[in-house]
Amino acid sequence: MGRAYQNRKLSMAKTAGAKTKVYSKYGKAIYVCAKTGGIDPDGNLSLRGLIDRAKKDQVPTHVIDNAIKKASGAGGEDFVEARYEGYGPGNCMVIIDCLTDNGNRTIKDVRQCFSKNHAKIGTSGSVSHMFDHQAVFAFKGEDDEAVLETLMMADIDVTDVELEDGIITVYAPHTEFFKIKTEFTNSMPEYELEIEELSWVPQNYIDVEGEENLENFEKFIAMLDDCDDVQHVYHNAEIKD
């Protein structure tokens, strides 16, 4: 699972849009998180985690601060979460999470991404039952057994720990995210976390093969990434080098 998870992250990184678009998506997510859960990161752990990820992705401090400041005021924009599921090129499964202030616009944009790339949008729950909501941490290291032992000694429920190509990947139920992050900070500070996120991890992967499918897949992901309302795309496609 670990290598495939890294491949998925890489495929998203390859098609990432301009930095300003990435900043905009983080700004929107931080605004919504602060608006709904409070502007103090110490009291809003979800906000704290989101800010940490934004900084790791080199989002400027002023973008983060402006989003929180905006959330602290009265009124403001109303965003709602929207999720779409379906089958992408090569019959891979896809989950798309959005934040939108105009549901009609968002579904129109997402449908267009599917229809233009030989993909098929599905109904709610059509593929999400084939994904697990997981806390995922990845970092350079060699002693995966020691990492597992440390986490278990801290009474943390760990789904799996994998070591491949010098990268250790920890998977755990999403409810364990902040316990694991705290344990790394307190007990394993020598590890620099390259990935620390809540993700929908597929239970199995599918190879996307054939030149046409590969081209459509890359275009599909790029079009979704270009949609302003799309926050996250999860899929079970594995792309061979």
Swiss-Prot record:
GO cellular component: cytosol
PANTHER family (alphabetical): TRANSLATIONAL ACTIVATOR OF CYTOCHROME C OXIDASE 1
Name this polypeptide is given: Probable transcriptional regulatory protein CPS_4169
Short name of any one Pfam family annotated for the protein: TACO1_YebC_N
Keywords of the record: Cytoplasm, DNA-binding, Transcription, Transcription regulation
Molecular function terms from GO: DNA binding
Location of the protein in the cell: Cytoplasm
SUPFAM superfamilies documented for this protein: YebC-like
Family matches, as InterPro entries: Integrase-like_N, TACO1_YebC-like_2nd/3rd_dom, TACO1_YebC_N, Transcrip_reg_TACO1-like, Transcrip_reg_TACO1-like_dom3, YebC-like
Main location: cytoplasm
GO biological process, one term: regulation of DNA-templated transcription
The family this protein is said to belong to: Belongs to the TACO1 family.
